[in-house]
Curated annotation (Swiss-Prot):
PROSITE patterns: GNAT_NAGS
Gene that this polypeptide is encoded by: arg2
Pfam families: NAT
UniProt-listed InterPro entries: AceGlu_kinase-like_sf, GlcNAc_Synth_fun, Vertebrate-like_GNAT_dom
Recorded family membership: Belongs to the acetyltransferase family.
Reactions the enzyme catalyzes: L-glutamate + acetyl-CoA = N-acetyl-L-glutamate + CoA + H(+)
Organism classification: Eukaryota, Fungi, Dikarya, Ascomycota, Pezizomycotina
Protein name: Amino-acid acetyltransferase, mitochondrial
Extent of Basic and acidic residues compositional bias: 392-406, 415-427
Subcellular location: Mitochondrion
Organism: Botryotinia fuckeliana (strain B05.10) (Noble rot fungus)
Length: 734
């Protein structure tokens, strides 16, 4: 019994041990299985993570590649547009000098390590893929990078363009995006734009909808402009709460330079985005000062308010403020911003001119031509004159370079066939014509008012949306001309050259096609744009409006250079500075004083022309009618101060006055064959002739109908025989 109990006890212990062992091993097997499953699961998750990371990396690299490709395309288009502007070395030098920033040393944060040279910034903000070389890094630039802190911008002048876009609701997205691309290019060239949106389109839409709905439509179009600029790679921002409207009786409204009471109330809301390289876009909406009620206003009032703000003409200060404090405050405002351009993008284009073949003023010297342009616009509605077409028909021909083997008859022969020209908008209703004239008059008045309070260096450009959107795209090939040449963008060309795309003193026939169906090279097609400056007055002695320039009559006193109206010392300085030669004044006076036809002076003797009546050799100077008929109108001196050469349009102003007001029937002159200005003369003359056995080239502007063989021979004889009056006598050798 004892043995049985012992065996039973041992059996239970063994069984328990076996059960425990089995349980233990079972747990081990379960844990091993779980480990295998967990390892497999972890391995699968890692693969998925790696795949996702690889996919994300590929997408990122692809995105970067596409971004670089897009940036290169933008930069290529940008550089081609700049190169297509055809700026000369002098114009490029002037652009760099005018847009040179102040030399400032902004304070550095304490934690910042001293950096001697920063080669990671892009010169002149020309693109993120181009690292600045030493030449680029040291070149003058003022465009501020959006990422640069405000402390680094405090010392630089912001160069600003004020842009008004009229009727954007009539423009498709492609054109609007093109305008945004152009404004982006201007920003990269250093001219950051403030855009004002004008939804007036000549219809009565704003009268058919509520005031609230009209304001919403204006904001919608402003948002389209913001989107178009953003799409070009330059950031824009809608700013709709900076324009205030003064109530009746307020101090602001009483100020004459704040006409209409429209003014800027929150300057920093404008300046903050400008400092960061962001383009503010303003709808033509203002808020009353007292109640902050939103009101739609005219875009021209907004533009003038911004012009006054950027020019430093702010609302009046407190009467208790010290004058010196006010003066310093105004100087600080003017040193912060330079409003260099006023750009009006209008579907109607530039200011019409009834007496020009192309139909538009190319250049307006507002000081001299504003009233004349206004009266012409009111009288004709801007329609082209058929009478002017016939009188300038000969200007269509190319410039002739006469040689000895070409007979005179080859260029005096009249062309057969009359030009047929249809005036622009001749079939429009009187209401439409009145609307066009209203918009043109508003643009003309806006340009004049803005330029009147801006520095003389500021200018204005009025052009069409299509021209503003032109980014130098390739044109389809035309068999009749070189159809693949790039067309200039007038905004970029104007920024780099401070000139219109075409000179205003060119003969009208060379400014564009004679007929709308005539094939013409795109690079020579005239854009319907008008360039304007405040300019300078032009004084003409004697005034051809009251005393037409005619050959001298025996016994009748003639004007002389010693006349009290003429400042002879300043005239002599003008001639000597322009020609870089000393004039033998007494010898010159003896030669010209009895032959002077008239004198043209631009501004404060910045440019001028002296014209005489010359007798061909062999013709007796007896005062007879026959002698007077043989007298030749001769341009004796054409001079522009060196500091005014190549800019400001001084030469064009003088030349245009000469051929338009003084000698519309033609004038001749000569120039040394190696004179670098001959190209300029050649473009403005009707014909040229290299005089045999001399170092002279003859030019003249005489129309074909006024030219005959005797006149041509008289021109040639006079240009060969006139003796120079320089003090060094070197001109005699020519």
């Amino acid at each position: 019994m004892l043995l049985q109990n012992l065996a039973l006890k041992k059996g239970k212990e063994a069984a328990g041990h076996n059960i425990q062992s089995l349980t233990k091993h079972g747990n081990y097997f379960v844990q091993s299985s779980d480990r295998r499953r967990a390892y497999t699961s972890n391995q699968s998750a890692a693969d998925k993570v790696r795949e996702e990371l690889a996919k994300e990396t590929c997408e990122k690299l692809s995105s970067q590649h596409q971004a670089k490709k897009k940036a290169k395309a933008i930069d290529r288009d940008f550089f081609l547009s700049v190169l297509g502007s055809s700026a000369t070395k002098r114009e490029a030098r002037s652009y760099i000098q005018n847009f040179k920033p102040l030399n400032t040393s902004p304070a550095k944060p304490i934690s910042q390590e001293p950096v001697h040279k920063n080669t990671n910034e892009n010169g002149a903000n020309l693109g993120s893929i181009y690292t600045a070389t030493r030449a680029v890094a040291e070149s003058p630039k003022f465009v501020q990078q959006p990422a640069v802190s405000q402390s680094t911008l405090g010392g630089s002048i912001l160069h600003v363009a004020l842009v008004k876009v009229r009727a954007p609701q009539l423009l498709d997205d492609e054109t609007l995006n093109g305008i945004g691309k152009t404004l982006s290019k201007l920003c990269r060239l250093g001219l950051i734009s403030t855009v004002v949106v004008d939804c007036e389109d000549g219809t009565d839409t704003h009268l058919k909808v509520s005031e609230c709905e009209w304001r919403n439509r204006i904001k919608e179009q402003a948002a389209r402009v913001v989107t178009a600029i953003d799409a070009s790679g330059t950031e824009a921002r809608l700013v709709d709460n900076v324009i205030g409207i003064a109530e009746d009786g307020s101090d602001v409204k009483q100020q004459p330079y704040l006409k209409g009471g429209v003014h800027v109330t929150f300057r920093e809301l404008l300046m903050t985005p400008l400092r960061r390289g962001v383009l503010p876009v303003l709808p033509s909406i203002g808020h009353t000062d007292a109640t902050q009620t939103a009101v739609s206003i005219t875009a021209s009032d907004v533009v003038l308010a911004l012009t006054r703000e950027f020019a430093g003409f702010r609302s009046p200060q407190s009467p208790d403020e010290h004058p010196n404090v006010v003066k310093e405050h105004l100087q600080a405002l003017q040193n912060e911003v330079s409003l260099d351009r006023l750009i009006l993008i209008d579907p109607l284009g530039g200011i019409p001119a009834s007496d020009r073949r192309n139909g538009y003023h190319v250049f307006l010297n507002m000081e001299q031509e504003y009233e004349q342009a206004k009266q012409d616009l009111i009288k004709t509605g801007g329609l082209y004159s058929e009478t002017s077409s016939r009188s300038t028909r000969a200007e269509a021909d190319s410039n002739f370079n006469l040689r000895d083997d070409i007979p005179l008859s080859s260029f005096t022969e009249q062309k057969s066939g009359e030009l047929e020209y249809s005036p622009r908008h001749q079939n429009d209703s009187p209401t439409q014509q009145d609307q066009r004239m209203k918009f043109h008059l508003d643009n003309l008045e806006l340009v004049r008012s803005a330029l009147a309070i801006l520095p003389p260096s500021s200018s204005a450009l009025v052009t069409t949306p299509d021209e503003a959107a032109n980014s130098g795209k390739q044109h389809e090939f035309k068999a009749a001309g070189v159809g693949t040449r790039r067309q200039r963008n007038p905004l970029i060309h104007n920024l780099l050259t401070d000139k219109p795309a075409f000179s205003s003193s060119l003969p009208a026939g060379r400014l564009g096609p004679l007929d709308k169906n005539e094939p013409i090279t795109p690079s020579t097609k005239l854009a319907p744009a008008t360039f304007a400056k405040h300019g300078m007055p032009v004084t003409i002695f004697p005034d051809p409006k009251t005393t037409p320039w005619q050959p001298p009559i025996a016994g009748v006193p003639q004007i002389s250079l010693t006349d009290p109206q003429i400042d002879l010392p300043r005239l002599v300085h003008l001639i000597e500075d322009s020609f870089n030669k000393k004039l033998d004044v007494q010898d010159y006076l003896r030669r010209v004083n009895n032959r002077i036809a008239g004198v043209i002076i631009a501004g404060e003797y910045e440019g001028g022309a002296l014209l005489t009546w010359e007798l061909p050799p062999g013709v007796p100077d007896d005062g007879s009618e026959e002698s007077r008929k043989r007298m030749v109108p001769y341009l004796d001196k054409f001079a522009v101060l060196k500091r005014s050469q190549g800019s400001g349009g001084v030469a064009d102003v003088v030349f245009k006055s000469m051929v338009r007001d003084c000698f519309p029937g033609g004038v001749c002159w000569r120039s040394r064959k190696d004179n670098p200005v001959n190209k300029w003369y050649f473009e403005r003359s009707r014909a040229t002739l290299k005089l045999m056995d001399t170092n002279w080239t003859m030019f003249f502007t005489t129309p074909e109908e006024n030219m005959d063989q005797q006149t041509f021979q008289d021109y040639e004889a006079v240009c060969k025989t006139i003796e120079p009056s320089w003090a060094d006598k070197q001109g005699v050798q020519d």
